């Protein structure tokens, strides 16, 4: 393999390493597989990624991904705007919707605090959350972060952020397994955690 081709192959490996839980060895295996067995599928993947990069943006209200100004949930006038559930990632919204346990709205942080990886408060979209709360309709904030070190750290920062604001604040009950990500929790357990959520502070100034 020429040096130029070697650079191209290594470039593919390096690009694949940005994916979650994909290290150098996994990236190398994926690269070999795509080039040897899945060239047409790889071209479709490139096209789909380019299209998504052009068309998918953040919802102006909840910060999740969508193709218009507002996602379908935020645009739904039948949702209860008095309750705002704060979650880590868009997948958490999908799981909550599948569990059919929350008829309010959401805000997606798109990150969580992980001091070991140097991810501090700047990793979560507090500025956008503050803007979202400016409308005045919200009465209760439901913190729906995972019961992991990162999720607990994020929940603590959120609790401090809301401490002097006039909202009732609650967090999912610990029916969710310790160390469990919401993405992997079954619908029944998730619904119970919402219904039995723990009060952090009452509403009012």
Curated annotation (Swiss-Prot):
<dbReference type="InterPro" id="IPR000093">
    <property type="entry name" value="DNA_Rcmb_RecR"/>
</dbReference>
<dbReference type="InterPro" id="IPR006171">
    <property type="entry name" value="TOPRIM_dom"/>
</dbReference>
<comment type="similarity">
    <text>Belongs to the RecR family.</text>
</comment>
<dbReference type="GO" id="GO:0008270">
    <property type="term" value="F:zinc ion binding"/>
</dbReference>
<dbReference type="GO" id="GO:0006310">
    <property type="term" value="P:DNA recombination"/>
</dbReference>
<dbReference type="Pfam" id="PF21176">
    <property type="entry name" value="RecR_HhH"/>
</dbReference>
<keyword id="KW-0234">DNA repair</keyword>
<dbReference type="GO" id="GO:0003677">
    <property type="term" value="F:DNA binding"/>
</dbReference>
<feature type="zinc finger region" description="C4-type">
    <location>
        <begin position="59"/>
        <end position="74"/>
    </location>
</feature>
<keyword id="KW-0863">Zinc-finger</keyword>
<keyword id="KW-0227">DNA damage</keyword>
<dbReference type="InterPro" id="IPR015967">
    <property type="entry name" value="Rcmb_RecR_Znf"/>
</dbReference>
<comment type="function">
    <text>May play a role in DNA repair. It seems to be involved in an RecBC-independent recombinational process of DNA repair. It may act with RecF and RecO.</text>
</comment>
<protein>
    <recommendedName>
        <fullName>Recombination protein RecR</fullName>
    </recommendedName>
</protein>
<dbReference type="InterPro" id="IPR034137">
    <property type="entry name" value="TOPRIM_RecR"/>
</dbReference>
<dbReference type="Pfam" id="PF13662">
    <property type="entry name" value="Toprim_4"/>
</dbReference>
<dbReference type="InterPro" id="IPR023627">
    <property type="entry name" value="Rcmb_RecR"/>
</dbReference>
<dbReference type="Pfam" id="PF02132">
    <property type="entry name" value="RecR_ZnF"/>
</dbReference>
<dbReference type="GO" id="GO:0006281">
    <property type="term" value="P:DNA repair"/>
</dbReference>
<keyword id="KW-0479">Metal-binding</keyword>
<feature type="domain" description="Toprim">
    <location>
        <begin position="82"/>
        <end position="177"/>
    </location>
</feature>
<keyword id="KW-0862">Zinc</keyword>
<dbReference type="Pfam" id="PF21175">
    <property type="entry name" value="RecR_C"/>
</dbReference>
<keyword id="KW-0233">DNA recombination</keyword>
């Amino acid at each position: 393999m020429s040096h130029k081709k070697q650079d191209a192959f290594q470039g593919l490996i390096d690009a694949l390493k940005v994916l979650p839980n994909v290290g150098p060895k996994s990236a190398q295996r994926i690269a070999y597989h795509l080039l040897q067995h899945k060239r047409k599928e790889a071209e479709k993947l490139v096209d789909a990624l380019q299209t998504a990069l052009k068309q998918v943006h953040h919802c102006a209200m909840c910060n999740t991904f969508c193709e218009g100004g507002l996602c379908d949930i935020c645009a739904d006038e039948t949702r209860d705007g008095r309750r705002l559930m704060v979650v880590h990632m868009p997948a958490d919204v999908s799981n909550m919707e599948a569990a059919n346990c929350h008829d309010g709205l959401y805000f997606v942080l798109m990150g969580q605090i992980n001091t070991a990886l140097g991810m501090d408060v700047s990793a979560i979209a507090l500025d956008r959350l503050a803007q979202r709360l400016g409308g005045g309709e919200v009465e209760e904030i439901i913190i729906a972060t995972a019961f992991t070190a990162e999720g607990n750290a994020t929940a603590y920062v959120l609790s401090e952020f809301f401490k002097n604001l006039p909202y009732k604040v609650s967090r999912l009950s610990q029916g969710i397994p310790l160390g469990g990500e919401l993405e992997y929790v079954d619908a029944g357990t998730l619904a119970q955690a919402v219904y039995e959520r723990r009060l952090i502070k009452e509403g009012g100034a």
